[in-house]
C-alpha cells in the first residue's frame, strides 16, 4: 500500500484525498465499512495466532500461489487508480465525474472491489492461515452489497452509466456477476 500512496502523492493528490475520505452518509455503507474493519482485524491478526500455535499447515506451494494472487490484485488496484481519478472511498458522484470505460473498467464495472476481494481472500493463505481464510470469504458478499448499492447511485446520478452497464455486463467477476 505504501507504493500506491507514493504513486498518488506524485501523480494524483486529489485522488489521494478522495481515497482518505471517511464521510460516508448511507447507513448501509456505514455498516459495510464497520464490518470491513472487523474483517481486517481478523485477516491480519488471526494468522499471527495461527502461526504461534501451529493451527494450520498450509503447504508452501499454496502460500506461493496466494502470494502471486495478492501481487496480481495489487497490480489491478494500481491500474484502477491510474484509470479512475474519481475512485473515492465514499460512494458519491462528483462534479465533472465521467464514466470510465478503459483499462480494468472495460472488463468489470467495479474492478477495485475485485482487487480487494482477491487481495484480502488470498492474504490469509499467503500468511499461512486456513483459520483466517475462512472468515475472509465474508468479504465477498460485503463488497458485492457495496457494489450493488453503489450502482443504484451511479445509475441515478452519473450520466452515461446506464449505457456503460449495457456494454460492460459484469459487476465484479468476469463471466459470473
Feature-to-residue mapping (PLM):
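Membrane-anchoring alpha-helices and their flanking helix-loop junctions
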Residues: 1-102, 114-177
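Short pre-catalytic strand/loop immediately N-terminal to key active-site residues, enriched for Gly-Thr
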Residues: 105
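Conserved SAM-binding loop
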Residues: 108-109
